Amino acid sequence: MNAVAPSAISCSIRPGDEAASRRRSRWIAAAQLGLISSTFSTIVSQLFAARIGRDAAVDWMTVAAIPARDWAISAEPSWSAILAGIAFHQWADFSWALVFFGVLGRWTADLRPLTILLLALPWAVFSSSMEWFMLVPLFPFWQPLFTLQQPYWIGLLVHSSSAVMYPLFARLRWTGGAAPARNVRFTNAWITGALALIALLGATALFGGHGYEPPWMGHDRDADQTYIRHMTAHHAQGIALARIAAERAQDPHLRKLAMLMVASQTGANRIFETWWLSWFDTEMPDCSSDERAAMPGFLTQAEMRQVKAAPADQFDTLFVETMSKHHAGAVRMADQMWHSGGDLRLRVMAHAIRHEQQGEIALMHGASGIAAVTTAFRNMLGDNVN
């Protein structure tokens, strides 16, 4: 038998074939990383949401409304909308990973884990900005609700939680266990840290679900208690008003927006009640009639009756006018809390309420396109309705 020379074997592997194989491996690793990072982000977002005053179910429903429009919105988030929101979020995170390691792989694929991490965090800023400022409210989705409903920092947190898993690519791109030992050590430690974080957030969420949140950490107990009581009462009236519109509004889109108001404010009140019981270990007292009358934007009984009794052809206009007044009052209250020395969780939640309710005023008045983006950016920075 004739022996084949080693040089002949090496020559049979052409440079073009080797490059193609590397590209395939890179794209496969990018897809694997996308699945890991998007799943990690979903888990962290779900477990952490309530700790900063977010109702995860409402947020997933809002995300589902990006591609599914009004179908996804209901007064109580449905499982189909929640799952659609999670699926759309994971698809988006998966796609950003493919861009980072696939499309841009010529520059990113061979980096060390720590270098990837240092680049991934600015990438999270870029990708979340692209979604919030352009891809969702403008081309290709033309859906202003997401940007007007959720302040930018929520998307930044979500994208950051995905980006922190990018260093695992430095191990995934090597086939057959050929990854350098330093990459293996780094990624082993990184995976351990990620699992520990999930366990910590899971335990915190479990205790929170049973009424044991991390303790109150504000500076003025009376001020924080007053804010929670007042905003809970204010939201309760907003829910009652929105429920009327969810049944009576002539414009189908306005009906759906009213349902979203019910869902978001109901979720906020659940969080307020959980925090109150956990922090202060007592039932939340009702607001007195004098307190209600003094709240900005709180409606009188006569105003509520006027909306209920409005003729069908006048209802939408009256509801938008009345709810805009009510929302403006909540914006003022939330803005005061944001600038106070209250518990950080209350302040973060207040910032989101200020943004959300100004955004809903804009949506009721038909904001869309670049005007919606401009309005959302201004709303994120301050009170623009009082």
Segments from the language model and where they lie:
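Hydrophobic cores of alpha-helical transmembrane segments in multi-pass inner/ER membrane proteins
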Residues: 3, 95-98, 156-173, 238
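N-terminal signal-anchor transmembrane alpha helix
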Residues: 21-54
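Extracytosolic (periplasmic/ER-lumenal) interhelical loops and adjacent juxtamembrane/interface segments
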Residues: 50-82
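Interfacial helix-loop-helix junctions of multi-pass membrane proteins
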Residues: 51-55, 132-156
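Hydrophobic alpha-helical transmembrane segments
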Residues: 83-105
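Internal alpha-helical transmembrane segments of multi-pass membrane proteins
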Residues: 106-129
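Cytosolic-side transmembrane helix boundary signature
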Residues: 165-192
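All-alpha RGS (Regulator of G-protein Signaling) helical domain and cognate RGS-like helical scaffolds
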Residues: 183-386
